Amino acid sequence: ECSRFERVSLSMITDLTVGYQLYQNRELDELELSESTLTTITSDTSNAYNDQLCEKRPTKYAYDFHFNFYCLNTDGTPNENWNKAVANRAFRRCFQEGLNLIPYYARFNKINPLKCENNYYTMKGVCYNSKGTDYVDLVAKELGIDGEKYDGKTMVHLRKSTADSIAALKKQAMDELTAIGVTFPVKAPFFFVAGNTVAQDNATVLKQCFTDSFGDDFIQLDLGTYVSSLAKEVRIPKLHGFVINGWGADFGDPVNFVGQEILHDSNAYYAVNYSNIQLVAEEPADYQKELVDEFEQFTDLVNAANAIVDDTDARYEAFAKA
């Protein structure tokens, strides 16, 4: 037997704080919790909702920092300080090798923050080779992190870093950038939706991650807000320093991911709409030529991999090298 129902109601909420109030009023059956609400519940075993918690499944998207290499100010002039900084390899390496994001991850999974860590441009489970090996495991091997396992304590990319190595990398970046006129701290424009307390708290925690990782003399998040549309108000005017965005698989092949960041392809979504690297490549300044050369090499590797259509294993290996 089955029982029928007349309708299903979907409630649109402004942020999770409002959603929690609706849940308490029994107007919602389930809800994702903000970090502060989750902390309140888990710190009190007698809390009425303490036994109603469950860890939600990982997102199906691969979330990444997407740098903007052609950042503009609100008046339409180039944000030269950021553009020079982000074109520098040592500066970008500091993000990958020295930025501790565990407090930021805790905003999305308070209990097991490092389950939010993403080490690959492609999400897990997209495709497997003939031996049943996940494509991202092939990427891990190329990155030299295939032996690193989840330990719940340390981000994978930080395990080979030391305070001295990061200090040296930071000094290298600052020396190289000072030589071309960059002033410090470099302000990284980062936007969140106005009126959303959870988004504001997320951005504030992320800003603190930069402070804790590098100090305030190197990189600082310059927080800004948009009213309703990130695309219309931030991305299209090219105001962002970087955007955190997730990409899911439209089809089960690595080109669905890495193909979004190549040059000379108007369909490369991230290259055209987020990083704006194609605009830089048209007439790169001296400080951008190494960056463009790296993208050219990456583009060649992706195109070479995409041309392999008769050997799936070789295709995946080639994409992993890219």
Labelled PLM ranges:
Residues F5-S11, F184-G195, L221, G241:
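Short, well-ordered beta-strand elements
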Residues S3-F5, N47, E55-T77, N81-V86, ...:
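Short, solvent-exposed loop/turn segments at the edges of secondary structure
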Residues S9-D75, I102, A106-F108:
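Extracellular/periplasmic solute-recognition and catalytic clefts
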Residues Y20-Q21, T39-S43, F65, T74-P78, ...:
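Extracytoplasmic/secreted cell-surface and envelope-processing proteins
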Residues V86-D212:
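Append "and occasionally in soluble cytosolic enzymes with long acidic Gly/Pro-rich linkers
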Residues E6, T17-Q21, N25, T39, ...:
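Solvent-exposed, polar/charged alpha-helical surfaces in well-ordered, non-transmembrane soluble domains
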Residues Y23, L28-E30, N47, C209-N273:
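Periplasmic binding protein-like
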Residues R92-R93, E97, L101, Y105, ...:
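Extracytoplasmic/peripheral linker and loop segments enriched in polar/acidic and small residues
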